[in-house]
Amino acid sequence: MERALIRQEISKACKRLALTQQVVTMCELEATPRQEEFLYQVLSQELAYRERLRRERLLKRAAFPVRKTLDDYEWTALRLPAALPAEDVTSCNFVRMKRNLILYGPVGTGKTHLAIALGVAACEAGLETRFFTAASLATKLDEARRSGNLEKLLQSIDRAELVILDEWGYLPLEKEQAQLLFQLISSCYERRSLIITTNLSLIHI
């Protein structure tokens, strides 16, 4: 790698690591090309290490019941609308564009697997994600409301760029729970992406 390019990469790495540009200045004044190459490798390894830690934190906060990947998903059961290319789904572009997915079909068609796999992919892409079953989230919201902690819970969810609601319609909800859940969904509109899995037909969602 050319020396000028190495210095550019060192400068970028310093910014990402929140280091001052004094490192770059010292390189330009005192370091040999070999020393600059070594420093570049050290900074690159530190960046990679921090990125791995960040992904693990995102995966932990997402609270997936299990971890699934897109590699072992059976794609033959999936039909996407023409307006949503598969690339936008697998690359998580739909999250960046704040678009929503409703995965519906009979039990055993891999809806939850795909939802979790997309959530894992989003975390690996650095996107804050939260996973809930619809019933568990409704219960959490209701309990938080009763205990006066609703705002705190909503703020936690508000940090997410992707919210996954699994098993929509699987269990009946109390009126207050349903209202809180619908309010949350409404607040997500054009602000973050939702993935909802359900075995209900669209007219019943």
Put a short name on every predicted segment:
Residues 16-65:
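Interdomain "pre-motor" coupling segment immediately N-terminal to P-loop NTPase/helicase cores
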Residues 203-205:
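Conserved small/polar residues in nucleotide/adenosyl-binding loops
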Residues 100-112:
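Walker A/P-loop nucleotide-binding motif
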Residues 82-84, 130-157:
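Short glycine-rich substrate-engagement loop in P-loop NTPases that contacts/grips substrate
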Residues 127-128, 159-162, 190-196:
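Loop/turn-to-beta-strand initiation segments
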Residues 109-127:
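Walker A/P-loop
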Residues 71-89:
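N-terminal pre-Walker A segment at the start of P-loop NTPase domains
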Residues 91-98:
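Phosphate-binding P-loop
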